Amino acid sequence: ANYLRNITNRCDLDVHKVKDGEEIDLGGKTLTFISAPNLHWPDSMMTYVKEEKLLLSNDGFGQHLASDGLFVNEQPLDLVVNEAKSYYANILFPYGAQAEKALNTAGTLGLDIEMIAPSHGCIWSGKDEVNTILGPYAKWASGKNEGKAVVVYDSMWGATAKMAETVMAEFQDAGIPVTKHCLAVENVSEVMVDFLDAAYVCIGNPT
């Protein structure tokens, strides 16, 4: 509250600090607040509009997806889910505990969510779409891995690349699914998606 007063230079600014689960009636629209710190700003918060069964989820459940459509059902579903996974892996990955807490709070409050409108990307509409993203989000936030390995490397003269091949072969011989990424030619944001549910991460760095 004091921060808002200071940055607006209004010492008399009337600020009400809301808590998890607190409701405010705007006159026909009831807002319920869910604190979501570091998702992905320190002051992030989600807001549930009771009458619309709508969760305004801030950065949660979002995607970096350029689309002329507003809704998920205007895109291939697997594309949007993959983009949501990429957004989580690259933006929210370090804050799994906070994401899990926000999900648990929503569950504890018994929110009946039929639409999720994130700050970025398409809107999830209908119970089926909402459940389609809630499940993966709970998994990502929990930190559960899929038992796979990721080998990431760059190589100046080929020696580190040979080492990466050897490490990859060891995982394959052990029956462990493994993917390999050369950072000289691959996008780091795509590598992060593999990191999200990996049990083993091996990084090769040339000297």
Language model features with spans:
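A generic local structural motif
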Residues: 18, 34, 41-44, 101-104, ...
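Short, flexible loop segments at the rims of nucleotide/cofactor-binding pockets, characterized by
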Residues: 31-37, 91-95, 177-183
